Amino acid sequence: MNRTRTNDRFARTRTGSADSGRGGSRFGSSAPRRSGEPSRSGGYGRRPVAAQAEFALPKTITAAFPAVEGFADLDMPGALLAALGSQGVTVPFPIQAATLPNSLAGRDVLGRGRTGSGKTLAFGLALLARTAGQRAEARQPLGLILVPTRELAQQVADALTPYARSVKLRLATVVGGMSIGRQVSALRGGAEVVVATPGRLKDLIDRGDCRLDQVAITVLDEADQMADMGFMPQVTALLDQVRPGGQRMLFSATLDRNVDLLVRRYLSDPVVHSVDPAAGAVTTMEHHVLHVHGADKHTATTEIAARDGRVIMFLDTKHAVDRLTEHLLNSGVRAAALHGGKSQPQRTRTLTQFKTGHVNVLVATNVAARGIHVDNLDLVVNVDPPTDHKDYLHRGGRTARAGESGSVVTLVTPNQRRDMTRLMAAAGIVPQTTQVRTGEEALRRITGAQAPSGIPVVITAPVVERPKKRGATSRGRRRPASAARRAPVRQSTAGAAA
């Protein structure tokens, strides 16, 4: 329900997907221009989108509770506190320490924290603690977490699952690109908490497979990206269906005027916590702008990809991602592509291969720019510079997470330099700028670049051995003589494998 009047000028949202083609690349031709999308030539010299100033944050009428020093100081179920200990989570991050005392008390929360700052537990623990002990009816969840992408939905669900189990809450993930039948079954069986992308949740509601009138706690994670991706009409339509007077929590890495509509319309006397500067700067992150000649960029990219260690490389278009990935594989670099043109099972498999080290280079469009956490990732490379300072911050947010160190490297050709200077200024970042050439010490020192082996590689799915299942119907029955004779062979094989 609308709590305050809204301003129509904030209801106009940007169109298009974060994964849509945005120009050409040295690794692929220009993607077809979508309706309403500005024309760009060659993918170089593009003018960044003008940075939007942050809106005036709402004033808190009711005083907020002070931050806590430890989880034990919070009014949470003992099972949740025990689960935190078993997961090795002992000290709250700043955004958790600041918001949890208020969210646990049922206050609306507007929180800003950089990517990797611990936002998931900041809202997740409060939602689980306040929902614990309740039981959802079929198709009627009690808590809702809205996120912009499938990858972020899966990461949020994975992060919260052990805590949900500790308080006997059922959690369902509702996203596009996956079996809708399984999601329907999960909702029919009863799920107290649903993590969802707006489009698939709307589809399920339209089918009659989900209702939101019992949702008492609603979370919007990465609200600014949902606005940027054109999801605002769907998001507001969903929020209008949840229980009136319920708790709302909005978390994001940036809070610009695209989010103002949601704050004005759905948050009531919110507690505002901003634990990071507006630019999202991270002290453990280094920013490098590498000036390269256009003719040298292709080779420089290949040498960086051949480094020892993992790296995420961002390009603008799906076609460019596929072209670069094919080139790297032919050059002897274990690379995999990630973009919106891949099916969800393919994307999940690729991320697993990257996280486990089966592939060293993840070549991606902005589909990977949010919600993907990879431990010990120390390098992100913008092969194609982003056109928006928020995209830059969220691409870079894949490294230097949770106090770790990392570097963000952007390859810039001569005709891109002016635009890159503007973008960095909008992001509040002063990068280290270096002129580099392939094979030179500066490129090796900053990125670990080295010549690839030149021996083509093929990435295959890792073989996972599964234990043989014994048929339940054979219990208490005499096996045929042929089966009995084969039994020692199977036993011997299993023993050898062990």
Each predicted region: which residue ranges?
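Non-catalytic, charged low-complexity extensions flanking SF2 helicase motor domains
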Residues: 2, 430-498
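N-terminal intrinsically disordered, low-complexity tails of helicases
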Residues: 1-98, 316, 497-498
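General helical secondary-structure elements
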Residues: 1, 5-10, 18, 22, ...
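Conserved helicase RecA-like core
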Residues: 66-455, 490
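Intrinsically disordered, low-complexity segments enriched in polar/charged small residues
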Residues: 8-10, 14-19, 27-31, 37-39, ...
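A generic alpha-helix propensity feature with a strong bias for hydrophobic helices
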Residues: 35, 41, 51, 61, ...
